[in-house]
């Protein structure tokens, strides 16, 4: 009798709500990835170090639209291996103070709160492939603007080019492999029945390692000082300021020297 009552109490709305939140939970689980350290390649490609520091000291929140984009990207990355297994998702960790690489095992042994992490730049290469004796660093990017990249005269995003140039530096430091070309593969995150699904690879030559390394170290030192001394780097007028920085309204009025007294 009690079982009959409990079945009667279960409504279609109850089921829909339960399934909805279970799906959202599954999305969150799928987006979890191992992320060691403090300073990452995604930090040292930014034009504004204040943006980077705000991002590290501010609690992270995410809208469902942000989740959708990240979730789709994670699914694509985990199910589209372009390179051989040993050259897919290549771990990168470089101590720029000691000029030494670290293996994943060595990095994992460093406690999360150890300040040594501030001496290390971390990253991960999607795929490294070899064509006619030349190494090419490939990076997959999902986008809602596939039509833009599909134009005959389009170029890859500058930030994506900068990212792969930094991967070149870490690849040489960590594996002694010198890649001279990069390729961003743009993949549409939209499903449109009236359009063909066409991934768009965009290849380019990479910059000299020394030039890129100097910029990486300079930015890493700014981040290290900011996190160690609790200081705020100078704001930098750049493309992020207008509509692309979630901290803009804070930054415009924030004249503090320190983010923590």
What does each of the following model-derived ranges do?
Residues 1-136, 144, 150:
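Metal-dependent nuclease catalytic cores that hydrolyze phosphodiester bonds in DNA/RNA
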Residues 78-84, 131, 153-186:
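Metal-dependent nuclease catalytic cores in nucleic-acid-processing enzymes
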Residues 117, 156-160, 205-212:
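Residue-level preference for long, well-ordered alpha-helices that form the structural scaffold
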Residues 132, 143-145, 187-191:
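Short coil/turn motifs at secondary-structure junctions
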Residues 146-158, 203:
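Short helix/strand-bridging catalytic loops that position acidic/His residues to coordinate divalent metals
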């Amino acid at each position: 009798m009690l079982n009959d009552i409990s079945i009667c109490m279960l409504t279609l709305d109850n089921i829909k709500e339960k399934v909805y939140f279970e799906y959202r939970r599954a999305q969150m689980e799928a987006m979890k990835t191992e992320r060691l350290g403090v300073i990452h390649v995604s930090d040292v490609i930014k034009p504004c170090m204040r943006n980077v520091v705000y991002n590290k000291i501010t609690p992270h929140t995410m809208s469902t639209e942000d989740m959708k984009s990240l979730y789709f990207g994670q699914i694509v990355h985990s199910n589209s291996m372009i390179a051989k297994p040993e050259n897919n998702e290549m771990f990168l960790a470089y101590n720029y103070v000691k000029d030494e690489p670290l293996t994943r095992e060595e990095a994992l042994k460093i406690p999360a709160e150890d300040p040594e992490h501030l001496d290390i730049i971390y990253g991960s290469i999607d795929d490294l492939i070899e064509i006619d004796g030349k190494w090419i660093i490939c990076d997959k990017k999902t986008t809602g603007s596939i039509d833009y990249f599909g134009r005959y005269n389009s170029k890859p995003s500058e930030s994506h080019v900068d990212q792969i140039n930094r991967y070149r530096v870490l690849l040489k430091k960590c594996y002694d492999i010198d890649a001279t070309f990069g390729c961003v593969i743009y993949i549409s995150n939209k499903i449109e029945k009236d359009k063909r699904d066409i991934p768009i690879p965009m290849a380019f030559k990479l910059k000299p390692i020394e030039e890129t390394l100097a910029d990486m170290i300079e930015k890493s030192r700014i981040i290290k000082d900011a996190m160690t001394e609790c200081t705020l780097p100078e704001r930098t007028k750049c493309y992020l300021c207008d509509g692309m920085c979630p901290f803009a309204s804070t930054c415009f009025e924030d004249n503090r020297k320190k983010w923590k007294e």
